[in-house]
């Protein structure tokens, strides 16, 4: 996953394919030091996406761009099957963010 914060319409936010099929989700993003820099519920719903800005601590300005680097994410989402069973799925991965 590759992102930029240059607002050119390409790679401007984290795309998680088909996440709209699982609205019961939460996403956390951490920097290389393990500090959470982003947290949200309902990722991908109504424009709720990660655009490379701080959004987890009240001590940091939410309008401040994150520095270039690799970030790690944890995505949890609830999956309901046809029989009515519910399963919570956990996915982890990384994002490379370029801040120009």
Label every model-predicted segment:
Residues 1-100:
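Short loop/turn motifs at secondary-structure boundaries
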């Amino acid at each position: 996953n590759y992102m930029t914060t240059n607002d050119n319409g390409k790679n401007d936010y984290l795309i998680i394919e088909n996440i709209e099929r699982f609205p019961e989700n939460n996403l956390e993003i951490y920097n290389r030091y393990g500090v959470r820099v982003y947290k949200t519920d309902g990722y991908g719903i109504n424009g709720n996406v990660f655009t490379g800005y701080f959004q987890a601590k009240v001590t940091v300005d939410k309008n401040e761009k994150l520095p270039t680097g690799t970030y790690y994410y944890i995505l949890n989402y609830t999956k309901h099957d046809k029989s009515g069973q519910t399963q919570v799925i956990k996915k982890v991965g990384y994002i490379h963010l370029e801040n120009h």
